[in-house]
Structure formats: structure tokens, C-alpha cells
Amino acid sequence: MFEVLMYLFENYIHNDAGLFIEPNELTDELLRAGFNQAEIFKALDWLEQLAELQHSDTSPYLITDSPQTMRIFTDHECKMLDVQCRNFLMFVERIGVTNGITREMVMDRLAALDKSFIGLDDLKWVVLMVLFNIPGAEVACEQMEDLIFDQPGDLLH
């Protein structure tokens, strides 16, 4: 599923090319690109759920963000994300690329990938996908792209 998400992000979402494409046409394109239909449907569902997160009033982690809160990772999350990944999540929050709300959106989408382990590179892409889905997060997206492509730039200033 992650490969389908990456393909969609790189070819449609990131450059706004897929904003008006019909779902059947998109599915056909992905099938022609060699993706499995079940994985395509999982990826499209993943993206739909991501879009729903920003409009959800039923998820308590989307209601408020307080700088006094501290994130404790569950045992399952610690197995899924190694120390390097957990430190990266704290780092991007500390430098203002994400906040508590977007961090929890990232955690939700990571869990939905249904992978037992998520590496740092995949984590970075999921963070970018989440940020890209949030209106007004253009600066955060640019900063995250710099982190993905190892161009620190002005992040630490």
C-alpha cells in the first residue's frame, strides 16, 4: 500500500495533477502502472481517512493542542517506530514543522499502514503527506521537504 501512496503523492497530489481525476480513471492508471487492485483500494481509503481527520470532531486529539502535553508512546508504537523515528517526531514538533495535533494525525496514519515496522524514510513521507493535506501548512511542507531531501536550510534558525 505504501508504494501506491508514494506513487500517488509524487504523481498527483504533490503537483495538484490529480485534483480532478475520476476515481475509476485513477484506479485504471494505477493498475496499468502495475499495482495490485487490493493495494490500490487500501491506499485510496488511507487517503480518504486522512482527509476526514482534519474535519473530524469525534477524535479527541484533534480538539486542542497544548505545549504542556507530553507524548508517551505505547508498546505497540515503540515496536513500530524505533528510537530514531520517535526522536524525529519530537524533533519536527520542537522546531514547529508539526504540532501535537498533526503529530497525532501522523500516528493515526502510521497505524493505518498496517506495518509492523516503519523506517525513518517512510515516516518522513507520511509526515509530509499529512502536512500536505492541511490547508495553510505550506511552510511546514517546505520545511519537511528539506528534511526529506537532507537540506537543513533555515530549519534551525
Curated annotation (Swiss-Prot):
Q: Which organism is it from?
A: Pseudoalteromonas translucida (strain TAC 125)
What InterPro entries does this protein map onto? Smg (IPR007456)
Which named protein is this? Protein Smg homolog
Signal sequence region: none
> One Pfam family name from the record?
DUF494
The Swiss-Prot or TrEMBL record describes its family as follows: Belongs to the Smg family.
NCBIfam families linked: PRK03430.1 (NF002897)
